[in-house]
Amino acid sequence: SKWTDKHEVIQGSRFDYDGGPFYWQYDFIVPLGIPNPIAPAAFGPAGYRVMDTLCFEGGLFNRRVVTEIGLPDPRFFIYWDDTMYGYRASKVTNPIVVPDVILRRTREIGNWDIAGVRQLNSTSDMNRYHIMRNRGYMARYFMTYGDFRPLVFGLGTVLTAAKEVIRLVMVDREHLKTGLVQIAKGWWDSRKLMHDPTWKPMPSLK
């Protein structure tokens, strides 16, 4: 295809459940460890955007990249796993997101519409826990690649927690009490992961 001839990691676009374009946060602010919510949606003159993250839904990988960086890390279980796989891939190639639509959401999800520009979607307490806990694994990979900045990453964690509290208040208020508990528990457990002496990154397949 016109993309696979020159690019090794490709992310297709998608439609939202209502048939409109689904905005996917392709720009990952590595020092903070958070997606950039205001990255331009347009693809520009090149017809694609270089990215440093990924979504497993619709992601296409060249075998060379997988061999080089290894398999996705199953310890994440859910959340940030594909983000960090895209980050790892960006260390050996330039992943891109393209305008070709390959997926469409079919389930409506409760959300808070932010000025008609972005949406904050409903999620589960299990997700809330892993959003916070898995920042521990994220930090370990940043350490592995020399990108870990403790103070800036700590700020990113505070911003992530604040976003989840806002999500609880604006979208998932019926889970406010249990949600706050899971955010705090995940944050606590992330600290333990950051200092786990037995942790090792996923190995290369070479």
Map each language-model feature to its residues.
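Conserved donor NDP-sugar-binding/catalytic core segment of glycosyltransferases
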Residues: 1-27
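A short acidic, glycine-rich active-site loop
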Residues: 117-129
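Active-site donor/metal-binding and catalytic loop motifs
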Residues: 98-119
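A structural signal for well-ordered alpha-helical segments within the folded catalytic domains
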Residues: 83-84, 126-133, 181, 185
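A recurrent flexible, glycine/aromatic-enriched loop bordering the glycosyltransferase active site
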Residues: 40-61, 119-122
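Non-catalytic, C-terminal membrane-associated alpha-helical segments of glycosyltransferases
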Residues: 143-206
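A short, conserved alpha-helix in the catalytic core of glycosyltransferases
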Residues: 59-70, 75-101
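A conserved mid-domain beta-alpha-beta active-site/ligand-binding segment of alpha/beta enzyme cores
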Residues: 131-141
